Design a protein with these regions (language model features):
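A polyanion-binding, active-site-adjacent surface
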Residues: 1-172
């Protein structure tokens, strides 16, 4: 599988007691080289999004479905997802977040086991395995399409309003 082509396992990082877990699809080249999730340009944008929402990278937990980089930056294959999904589920059981933020269509379709468009899933509360989930654009998509940033921010605001309600905290 992917173990033969990767440099590092990119398991995830952040607060193991986080109330928010951010999930992408798979590590990219920079993440594979460093062994850390979301460290390239997409990660820098994710950090800015989190900061705008009132969180630091250290307060949340950030991971991907796949723990190894697919060659050529391709989408994960079904057997790779089946191999890695138990690791993601164990991470979520240990952390037990209040909210999960899924980044992008591939991550959302994979986790929710559906084929819906990103537009049909974005910005609204979805429940999966007892977790409250929100879906927005992947930061890499925002870098390619800056006009989507407004929609992403609306999604993040919806997530934060929900977070404030369930955690009894004021936000935004």
């Amino acid at each position: 599988m992917l173990a033969g082509s990767r440099q590092n396992v990119v398991f995830g990082e952040g607060n193991p007691l986080a109330n928010i877990v951010v999930i992408g699809e798979a590590p990219g080249a920079e993440e594979d080289a460093s062994g850390r999730p979301f460290v390239g340009r997409s990660g820098q944008l994710l950090d800015k999004i989190l900061q705008a929402a009132g969180f630091s990278r250290q307060e949340v937990y950030i991971c991907n479905i796949l723990k190894c980089r697919p060659p050529g930056n391709r989408n994960p294959l079904n057997d790779e997802i089946r191999s890695c999904m138990p690791w993601l589920l164990q991470q979520l059981q240990i952390i037990h977040p209040k909210v999960i933020l899924m980044l992008g269509k591939v991550a959302a379709n994979t986790i929710l086991d559906n084929t819906l468009s990103l537009g049909a899933m974005r910005g609204k509360l979805t429940t999966w395995k007892g977790y409250d989930c929100f879906i927005t654009y992947h930061p890499a998509a925002l870098l390619r399409n800056p006009n989507w940033k407004k929609g992403c921010w609306e999604d993040i605001q919806a997530m934060m309003r929900h977070y404030a309600t369930i955690c009894g905290k004021e936000t935004l």
